[in-house]
Curated annotation (Swiss-Prot):
Domain FAD-binding PCMH-type: residue ranges: 18-189
Catalytic residues, chain numbering: 166, 218 (proton donor), 289
Name used for this protein in its record: UDP-N-acetylenolpyruvoylglucosamine reductase
Cofactor(s) for this UniProt protein: FAD
Pathway: Cell wall biogenesis; peptidoglycan biosynthesis
Annotated catalysed reactions: UDP-N-acetyl-alpha-D-muramate + NADP(+) = UDP-N-acetyl-3-O-(1-carboxyvinyl)-alpha-D-glucosamine + NADPH + H(+)
Species whose genome carries this gene: Nitratidesulfovibrio vulgaris (strain ATCC 29579 / DSM 644 / CCUG 34227 / NCIMB 8303 / VKM B-1760 / Hildenborough)
Single GO biological process annotation from the record: peptidoglycan biosynthetic process
Lineage of producing organism: Bacteria, Pseudomonadati, Thermodesulfobacteriota, Desulfovibrionia, Desulfovibrionales
Amino acid sequence: MLKVLEGPSLAERTTLRLGGRALAEVRVTSRDALDDLPGVLQCLGGSPLMLGCGSNILAADGELPVVVVSLDMDDAPTIVGETAEGVVVRVGAATRLPRLLGQLASWGLAGLEGLAGIPGSVGGAVAMNAGSYGCEFGTVLRSVEVFSPDFGLADVPHENIEYAYRHFGLKGCHGWFVVTGADIVLRRGESAAITAAMRANYLKKKSTQPVLARSAGCVFRNPAPGVSAGRLIDQAGLRGKRIGGMAFSEVHANFLVNEGAGRSDEAFELLQLAQEIVKRRHGMDLTLEVKILSWL
């Protein structure tokens, strides 16, 4: 079944708490309903925006020409087999990362401890190839279940998946698609040790990142291996820099935070300022990691 809502507020659906209204939101409550999704999107107009927990989105204010697509399917993590590479776990895209990590720890399955403290959904982690502390989601992917208007609902094996630093794609697919689930491969370990590692990683994040603030996570990609975007912003003198209600965090300069009454234009101004100063001082381009939604 598909549920259509008119004019959802993106400020209410994103962790930055910024943005105007989308044309509509389509909530997918079952896989059987996915076949109807292309027709519904065509009738509604606008570009489809796949949205999980909204933790990597910076949306402009005003009316935006997008239709939000969200999954309302509770696919709990399930062990479905074991191979020479490890234990295979199937998980739905709407599952929140903390829930997945907690289940993996209880099962004694290791491989994603570095993602502790990252908000968001499994679908978002796949789509952005989420990573932290030497761990990337793409490295544990065995296959991805996706829906596309080109080939319907399908399981895409690892060899047909493209992933790199904060990048995910499907070979031969050039249009939009919805990630609905994934099979991941983990290695066996000790539950207590895995839980301890996750807790240590979370506490480290909490002490070095504004994990409880209204933030979209890191806004810029690291421009090169070993080169931190946050350090470049800090060296540019922009740690704690404020414009209106938006600021680069005092805790970690690569985090843009909404201090309560921020506006999208203030956020865009800060991002542009950082790019200009870092380019002038270091000759390096800062590429956005956060997804921008605007009128264009």
